[in-house]
Amino acid sequence: MKIAMFCIPAHGHTNPTLGVVRELISRGHEVWYYSYEMMRGKIEAAGAHFVPCDAYDPQMRLSAEDSARIGKDLAFSTELIVRVTLALDDAVIADMQRLAPDVIVGDSMAFWAKLIARKLNIPFVSSTTTFAFNKESSKVMPSSRGSMLSFLTSLRKINKSLDLLREKGYQVGSVLDILQNDQETDTVVYTSREFQPCAETFSDHYTFAGPILRPVDTPLEKSGLPTVYISLGTVDNRHPDFYRNCLAALRDAPCRVIMSVGEGTDIAALGEIPGNITVQNRVDQMAVLAVSDAFVTHCGMNSVSEALYFGVPLLLFPLTPEEQGVANRVSALGAGLFLKEDTPDSIRAGIDAVLNADNLRASAKSLGDSFRRCGGAKAAADKIENTAGKPAHFSQPQPIMTPGQKAQALVGTTALILLLIALFTHGTVRRILLILGAILGLGSNIFRFLDKGKQ
C-alpha cells in the first residue's frame, strides 16, 4: 500500500506521527512524507520517503512562530492554506497522479492535504495531535479575542482567497469547509477518550490512539531527592526572566531541578546556577520525565501527554489559548495546579504544593493508564489501512453564497465588529458604535429578506 502524509513544520505535530510511520513500514507499506527541510532528519530516520514542500516555493518556508499561529490565527491560517495549496498544486497533484497513493494522511493543521485528497478523490485520514475539535468541544476551549477580531475584519479578503482555490478546481464553499472536520472524516487523535474534552460527542470515525512515544534512549538515574523538571517547550521558550525567577525560587530547595531553556536562551546571562539545579538548552525530555516528581510546563499537548504517561503531576503555566485549553483539561481532571504568578515565591509555593499532593499524583497516574490502554501506533495504522480500503468520502462543501448572502454576511460582519469595538469604548463613542451596529444589523436582515424573495 502507498501512503502520502502531509504535516506542518512543527515538532509537536510531527513527532507523534513517526511511530505510525514505523508501524506502517513494518507492515510492508511505503510512506511518502511531505513536510519541511527542518524535519527531514527525523522523518527519514523513521523510514519514510521525505519530500520537502519548501522546495516548491521559497516563499513557503515557515518560521517556528508562523507554525505556531496555524489554527489559532484564523485569518493567517486561511491565507496560508491558500498560498501553500496553490504553491503545491501543480507539483503535488502530478506526484499524486504518478504515485497513486491508496490514502492521504494529513495533519489537522495541514489543511492543504484534505483539499488535495478531495480534489483527486483519494481516501483521507486526519491526523490530530491536539485535542479533537467540534462544535461541542469548541465551547470549552478558550479562544483569542484578538484572533477572532482579526478573522472578522479579514472575511472579505478571505473570500477572495477562496475564489483562487475554486479557480484551480478545489471544491470549497466556505472557510469552514477547510477549518472543520465533520463526524464522517476518519480521524486519528493522539490522546485518550478520558483526556479528550467532550469525547462522547465524537463519532466512531474518530480513533483515540493515545500518545505515541519513542523509547527512552538513555535513562536517567533516580535521585534521592524529588526531581523537578522545568520547560517551556520548543517554540515560545525565550523567557529569561521566568528562568531567573525559577533559579531564585529553587536555589535552596531540597530537590534536584532540571531546567531546559531552549536553543535561543543564553544560559550565562541567567546568572549564577545553584548546585542543585542543572540548566541546559535542550534535554532528552522523555528521559527526564521518566524520573520526575513534578513538571513546570507551558502545557503544550505533547509535553503534557508525556508527563501524564509517566504519572507526573503538573504545575501549569500556559502561554497561548491552545495551551490554556490543555491546562484547563489537566486542572479539571485533577492532575495539576495553575501557577498563580511567575514570581519566585509563587513558583516555590506551586512546586511545593504539587510535590506534596497525593491526589494530583493519583490523577496523573490514572490518565497515564488511560493512555497505555489505547492502541497506539497499531491502532493508528489500523485506521489508515481501513480507510484506504474504502471508497473516498467527503461531505459536500457548503454552497457558495449568492450575491445577496454575500451582502448580508458583509453587513452583518461589519455590525458585529462595531459591537465588539464598542465593548472597549465609553461614552458618546460607544453609543454611536452601538447605534451603527444596530442599524447595520437591521440592514443585514433586510438583505436576507430580499434574497429569500428571489429564491
Model-predicted segments: where are they?
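N-terminal subdomain of nucleotide-sugar transferases
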Residues: 1-51
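A donor-sugar binding/catalytic signature common to diverse glycosyltransferases
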Residues: 21, 104-106, 280-328
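Nucleotide-sugar-dependent glycosyltransferase catalytic domains
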Residues: 29-32, 36-227, 232-255
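Short beta->alpha connector loops at strand-helix junctions that form conserved
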Residues: 51-59, 127-129, 299, 316-320, ...
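Nucleotide-activated donor-binding/catalytic signature segment of Leloir-type glycosyltransferases, i.e.
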Residues: 225, 254, 265-282
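C-terminal amphipathic helix plus adjacent low-complexity
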Residues: 344-424, 433-440
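Membrane-helix interfacial anchor on the cytosolic side
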Residues: 439-455
